[in-house]
Regions:
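Repeat-unit-sized solenoid/scaffold elements
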Residues: 105, 110-119, 139-140, 209-230
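ATP-dependent adenylation/nucleotidyltransferase module used to activate substrates
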Residues: 2-153, 158-162, 166, 189-197
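Catalytic subdomain that performs nucleotidyl-dependent activation
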Residues: 147-229
């Protein structure tokens, strides 16, 4: 058995209850995948998006619904080490990625106020646009259960408002496009266990604010979201 096959098997055996069943629960409950969909699975290079890619591959193998997948990697300005790490991990995991470039890190590097927020918005815009060019009608992001809770807390503590991260939503600016979050019910602790059991090493956020920990994939970087984790 190839190593990628062992990693795939662990998702539906060792982590069947904690990861696979929670993934399926989200997909079914929110009707995320439909007949004829072409879904761009957006890969940042971290543990969450890489797990999402593997789960979506497994879903395509086992589900009766007919749908297509594209595994989309946007290079926002990674250094050569991080870029190569993503390519190597995709090869290890048997994920056929499509990679394209943008200058997001260069732009965000000049912004002092809320750079992480601006970076996230710009990333999503580029991903929507590229996915549309490739004929996709949906993008899938790797946000998990902890991200949902942290978003609510961040809104309450920093924005004085109640806001949440929806499991799926229609794009306001890209007609016909929808965003889905299939890991909506999967907890980060279980993703970390999956990563460690399979001895996988992914990149963390790799902009100038967090580059000192890009290879550790264990948080850090001083963002508001990281403050929530602590």
């Amino acid at each position: 058995m190839e190593r990628y096959e062992e990693i795939e098997k662990s998702i539906i055996t060792t982590y069947r209850k904690k990861i696979w069943c929670q993934f399926i629960k989200g997909v079914k409950e929110f009707d995320m995948v439909q007949e004829g969909d072409k879904i761009a699975v957006c890969i940042s290079g971290g543990k969450d998006s890489m797990l999402l890619a593997k789960c979506m591959q497994e879903l395509k193998k086992h589900r009766k619904v007919n749908f297509d997948l594209v595994f989309l990697v946007m290079d926002p300005g990674y250094n050569p080490i991080n870029r190569q790490k993503i390519i190597n991990n995709a090869k290890l995991l048997n994920i056929p990625i499509t990679m394209f470039e943008s200058n997001i890190f260069e732009v965000v590097d000049k912004i002092d106020d809320h750079p992480c927020y601006i970076c996230a918005r710009m990333r999503r815009g580029y991903l929507y646009k590229k996915a549309q060019e490739l004929g996709c009608n949906k993008i899938a992001l790797g946000h998990h259960f902890d991200d949902v809770i942290e978003t609510i807390l961040m809104g309450m503590l920093y924005g004085a408002q109640m806001q949440t991260m929806m499991p799926k939503l229609h794009s306001t600016y890209h007609e016909g496009m929808e965003l889905i979050r299939p890991l909506y019910y999967v907890k980060e602790a279980d993703i970390i266990k999956w990563r460690e059991r399979n001895d996988l090493h992914f990149i963390q956020c790799a902009c100038r604010f967090t580059e000192h920990c890009t290879m550790c994939d264990n948080g850090g970087g001083g963002s508001k979201r990281e403050e929530m984790k602590k």
